[in-house]
Amino acid sequence: MAGRKGGDRKKAVTRSVKAGLQFPVGRIGRYLKKGRYAQRVGSGAPVYLAAVLEYLAAEVLELAGNAAKDNKKTRIIPRHLLLAVRNDQELGRLLAGVTIAHGGVIPNINSVLLPKKSPAAAEKEAKSPKKKTSTKSPKKKVAAKE
C-alpha cells in the first residue's frame, strides 16, 4: 500500500503539457498575478495568453527563417526579424511602433531616383508584339455570329 511516507508518486503534469504548449503557463500566470493587471486572474487566462504568445512567436520565427534562407544564411539575426515583420502586413501593423535593435531599414528606392530607360530599351519595347485584347470572350463571338 502506498501510504503517506513512501511509495510511488505520480509524475507531476504541468499545465503547459496539458494544454499542449511549449510556453510556460505557470510562469505566465504568476506574471499576470504579480503584475496586478486585475484583482483576480481566471484559471484559463494564462493558458490562453501562453497559446497566443506561442502562436505569434512561431509566426515571426517562420517568416524570419524564410528571410534568412532567402539571404542564404542558416542563423536568424535581427535583420531577418525586421524583414519578416515589416514585409508582413498584419505583423507590421501589430508591431508598427516597435524598434528592432540592429534591424536596419526596409530597402526602398523612390521611383524618381531610378535611372531613366535608355533609348535602346525603349525601342525594344516598341518592337515587341503586343497581344490584342478584345472586350468580348470567344464564346460570345461564336454566339453573335449565329
UniProtKB/Swiss-Prot annotation:
InterPro entries assigned to the protein according to its UniProt record, in alphabetical order: Histone-fold, Histone_H2A, Histone_H2A/H2B/H3, Histone_H2A_C, Histone_H2A_CS
One MF term in the entry's GO annotations: structural constituent of chromatin
Location, primary (coarse class): nucleus
Expression sites by tissue: Expressed preferentially in meristematic tissues of young seedlings, in stigma and ovary but not in pollen.
Gene3D superfamilies named among the record's database cross-references: Histone, subunit A (1.10.20.10)
Region (Disordered): 118-146
Keyword set, alphabetical order: Chromosome, DNA-binding, Nucleosome core, Nucleus, Phosphoprotein
Function: Core component of nucleosome. Nucleosomes wrap and compact DNA into chromatin, limiting DNA accessibility to the cellular machineries which require DNA as a template. Histones thereby play a central role in transcription regulation, DNA repair, DNA replication and chromosomal stability. DNA accessibility is regulated via a complex set of post-translational modifications of histones, also called histone code, and nucleosome remodeling.
Domain comment as written in the entry: Contains 2 SPKK motifs which may interact with the minor groove of A/T-rich DNA sites. Phosphorylation of this motif may regulate DNA binding. This motif is reiterated in both termini of histone H1 and in the N-terminus of sea urchin histones H2B, but its presence in the C-terminus seems to be unique to plant H2A.
Protein name per its UniProtKB record: Histone H2A.1
